[in-house]
Amino acid sequence: MKTMALMKKTAMPLLLALLAGTAQAEVHLSEVFGEHMVLQRDRPLNVWGRATPGQTLTVELAGRQARVRVGADGRWRAQLAALPAGGPHRLRVSGDQVVELDDVLIGDVWLLGGQSNMEFTLANTDTGPQEVASPQNSQLRQLRVPLRASVRPEAEIAPAPWVVAEPGRVGDFSAIGYHFARQMQAVQGVPIGLIDAAWGGSMLETWVRRDVALQDPDLAPAVRALPSDVEALTAALRQRVHDRVAAWQPGLPLEGVDASRWSAAADIDNDWPTLQAPQLWEDQGLAELDGVVWLRKRVQLSAAQAAGAAELQLAKVDDCDEVWVNGRRVGGQCGYDKSRHYSLPAGLLRAGANWIAVRVTDTGGGGGIYGDAAALRLDTAAGAVSLAGAWRARVEKVDVSSQPSANAAPTLAHNGLIAPLHGLSVRGVLWYQGETNAGRAAAYADGFKRLIQDWRGQFGDPDMPFLFVQLASYLPLASNQPGSGGWAELRASQAAALALPHTGMATAIDVGDADDIHPRNKRTLGQRLAALALHELGLRAAPASGPRLLAHEARGSEFRLRFGATAGGLRTARAGEPLRGFYLAGADHRWVPAEARFEGDAVVLRSAAVTAPVAARYAWVDNPSEANIVGGDGLPLAPLRTDDWPLESAGRRYQP
């Protein structure tokens, strides 16, 4: 809490006069500063805020002092000489009023960016219960930047506290940030401050600055079209979504509809369009739609299948569902990451036609039935009946929040969360994002590099470490298509950023979950990011990025990959298992699985189906969890390819 004390005056009239003029004689620190905060060590410290124009302010911290005059616009900014790690200290700003912040530490500050896997809280991880109950770590603090989309760069973040890592509160910390910080502290022994600015479901394009977006011909039109305020943006978004829904379900009104019979056991939906399930509706023509959508399916059952009780498996639903079978409500729940299972009593199903109706409410981000197709089924006494495929669907209601989502347009998240941090010194950035961009993966490579370079400019450090997580394994193994897939291509675009200096990539293909886009193991990723940071800072000699491809060549019917930076040689993740995850292609560009063997620091590939291989790939599928090559230190080999053939996503660009 910012505490404010008026300067003592010896004469009561002067004190009363001062009190009367308090509204005109204010001193404020920026909202990014607060008690329990951590400021960056060994760097000049910028402190800023607002005050009555013309005042002279004195800023003091741990023996450092600066004087500054408030500008005509009421803003002030002071710079203090660098401080070593330590504290707690008191920050004091004095003018016509005094503002003091206690329990200020000096250490390393790391900015956390990206989407929900970076946002994912410690309490929800596989080790959450133990971590949340651990003793207080007074040297670790977090500032969770409130989510706010803005059409113009904001001067302030929305008010939010710095929080000490203590039981009862640490569960809300970014799990990756927490495990990263613990590992860094074990080596460095200094305070760590985390600034969590991640936003679940956010696209890359929302995190770029306006000037950068204007340089991209795909983004520039949307940025130029941004209205002057959030209210106008919300109105435009509402109209855009309504127009999209009207085009998707032509002839079916949206306003004032009576949905009371949409759960009926009858063919009431013959004029409804269809959605594929399991699959989010944003990928099927209903982008940006939050609200209520009904999905209905007519299922034919035999007498044997209809006999007795049954179990309805609905994979997962984002976010809430209500379910009817043959007109009877059988259940409902909320939680985008929860599997849906509903028991159907004997007598509810019938031989012949049966109707399943699901009313889905999406409160933000993706919406619909999603997950593994095998988990969308009806388990009957006579076996399972698949429910995957086309469902009749109709939009009942569109909800447009008064606060637009991060993805309503490019630059919005940057304006609301990153722009207000301008001037703050940070040690580096941790980034986990890309799932939302998998549909236009090829374009991500250039956009990601532009973002890294621009953020370095904004924080005044051209060498600022930028460490990121490569997408984890996800989606059913059965859906893998060798040599293709949006997630596979997005990983390649992420890896392209390693061409920039002072970047590092933590591979996550071995810690994913086929059924959950949010793998619960965040400790491994935090520790891998810490290893990258320690190597970047010169505190770890060995590379922290797994084996690295040095050379490749075709030799007759075989293809040879030679590796370096293996930190103890190549091996499989578990001793004795065959090498998996490699693919070969000939001049026809057809990818087939390859047999593989180790030869020293090389892997030699062959396939009876490819007599003259010209290219190889490894872990190049959406879910490469079966790929099993690691270095001697256990760090996985990242997905790779030796070809430069066009990606499937080439040409797919951002569209409003």
Can you annotate each of these PLM segments?
Residues 25-53, 102-112, 119, 276-289, ...:
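Non-catalytic, glycine-rich low-complexity segments
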Residues 26, 32-108, 364-368:
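Ser/Thr-rich low-complexity repeats and stalk/linker segments
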Residues 41-43, 286-290, 311, 524, ...:
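Surface beta-strand/loop "capping" patches
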Residues 65, 560, 565-656:
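C-terminal beta-sandwich/jelly-roll accessory domains of carbohydrate-active enzymes
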